[in-house]
């Protein structure tokens, strides 16, 4: 049995609770719509994440195959020298955007791809295979950065969905039922009081009439 709220069983309290129930039902409807929309958005992004994860895995495999070919072409020692001469890539800038009020990361992943001059090994004797290897790993970097953004977005959306679900369930299964049960209790109490008052007045009237006739 649903527990009732600890309130005075008065008509004023009854009206106040009825207003609270209407507000709670409206809030429940809004939160349920938000929850449903968040779930739809989550699965849309989830599908994108799965596709991107496959692309990342394929690109990583391709990058290591290019690295193997470059090592065969110039040798491990030369390849190590070239790697040590490469300049650091651009810094990643993390901004923020909102998805239905949920703050999620926005990572600027442009500008990772560079030419040999920007990488810093243009004047070192190298080979086209080294360039292809560098380009492929830069593509990996772009994809991995994008994947990190999407996966963090999914984590935050999942957290918000769970939070919203708890609020929806609290309203649906605890708060609204308790208020409704309390309204029922107060209504029954007031009806009982009205009946008692009616019979009391009826008895008083009968006594007064009997006294008047005697």
UniProtKB/Swiss-Prot annotation:
The gene is atpD. The keyword Hydrolase does not apply. This is A-type ATP synthase subunit D. It is found in: Cell membrane. It comes from Thermococcus sibiricus (strain DSM 12597 / MM 739). Coiled coil: none annotated. The lineage of its organism: Archaea, Methanobacteriati, Methanobacteriota, Thermococci, Thermococcales. One of its GO terms (biological process) is proton motive force-driven plasma membrane ATP synthesis. NCBIfam families: PRK00373.1-4, V_ATPase_subD. It is a peripheral membrane protein.
């Amino acid at each position: 049995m649903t527990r009732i709220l600890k309130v005075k069983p008065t008509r004023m309290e009854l009206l106040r609770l009825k207003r609270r129930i209407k507000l709670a039902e409206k809030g429940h409807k809004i939160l349920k719509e938000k929850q449903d929309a968040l779930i739809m958005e989550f699965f849309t992004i989830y599908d994108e994440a799965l596709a991107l994860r496959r692309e990342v895995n394929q690109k990583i495999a391709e990058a290591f195959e290019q690295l193997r070919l470059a090592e065969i072409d110039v040798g491990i020692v030369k390849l190590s020298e070239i790697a040590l001469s490469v300049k650091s890539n651009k810094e990643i800038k993390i901004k923020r955007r909102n998805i239905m009020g949920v703050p999620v990361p926005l990572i600027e992943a442009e500008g990772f791809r560079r030419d040999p001059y920007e990488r810093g090994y243009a004047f070192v004797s190298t080979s086209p295979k080294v360039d292809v290897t560098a380009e492929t790993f830069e593509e990996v970097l772009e994809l991995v950065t994008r994947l990190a953004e999407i996966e963090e977005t999914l984590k935050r959306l999942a957290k918000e969905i769970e939070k919203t679900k708890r609020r929806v369930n609290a309203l649906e299964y605890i708060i609204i039922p308790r208020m409704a049960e309390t309204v029922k209790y107060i209504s029954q109490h007031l009806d009982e009081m009205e009946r008692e008052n009616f019979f009391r007045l009826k008895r008083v009237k009968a006594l007064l009439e009997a006294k008047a006739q005697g």
